[in-house]
Amino acid sequence: MTQKLKIIVLDANILIRAVLGIRTFSLIAEQKDKVLFCTPGVCYREVAFHLPTIAQKRNISFAMEQKALNTLNELKQLIAEIGEDVYGSFKQRALNRIGDRDEKDWAIVALAIALDSPIWTEDQDFFGTGIATWRTKNIEIFFAQ
């Protein structure tokens, strides 16, 4: 019997953890054949935009910042970048679920609704939206299910 591929939507903060750390990238790489990791394209753009500021705040060298940007491009081999054509029709439903929280996160919620999948995040804004959320500290439970 073949096992059904799991799907999970990644928030931008997970992409940041994957490019600046080791554990998150390793978790994704280890599970790439069992889990379809995906994220809205806006998350890749958000990470690329904020990475220089994050690097400066963390005193990360320019060379390491460039390595992180290269890793971000490598992630596209592991994490599918999904276009708004897939989830755009769920925008209003997503905004209704987010409520007065961070409305910029609508694409992540809409993609999760479109794919009927959970979200991997460290952001509290997704809790209470009616979508299962996983944090890095317990994501391996999701992988094992």
Across the structure, where does each feature detected by a protein language model lie?
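Acidic, PIN/NYN-like endoribonuclease modules and their adjacent C-terminal/linker elements
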Residues: 2, 38-39, 113-145
